[in-house]
Amino acid sequence: MPYLLSFLLCLSLSPIWPLGDNPRAGDPFIIVNKATNKLAYIDDGKIQKVFPVATGKTNELTPEGTFDIVMKAKDPYYIAKDIPGGSPKNPLGSRWMGFNARGTDGSKYGIHGTNQPSSIGKYISQGCIRMKKNDVEYLFDRIPIGTKVWIVKSKKSFQQLAKEKGAIAYEKANEKVGFFYCNKLS
């Protein structure tokens, strides 16, 4: 009985308890840091890759917060200027992963490719997150609908940010349970 109580206490205090903005430990998770214009792809409890990105011309254009990927498209159509998917003139590039920022349905804000690779690393978009072609295709192939995206402006490392959200291994003490450690209470 004391072991069961110990386990339940550890579980309820752990960062893997599925609450609000936190991803479930081990699930794919994306962090975009507007301070560095970089995107971290996290899966299986560790940072898999970090990519350079472009974000909004002004700080307000790219929304901050935790959102969900709600839409994915290959060779997306660019409605604003009636440019078909696959066209070299299409500013969305070869992939679109739309997220539900500011009450939208995934068609306004997204992580996408670009037809201007020299824009990567700059503050230049109208609010979306741009990636190089190979990078966006790599990410697109690995994240499912429902993946959490956390957009933040921070001086912290991706390692620190991911630990805050419970997305990577969290070391607390002696006994390993899933993606976190817990002290024995016996």
Positions of PLM-derived features:
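Bacterial N-terminal signal peptides
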Residues: 3-14
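Generic alpha-helical secondary structure signal
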Residues: 7, 45, 71, 174, ...
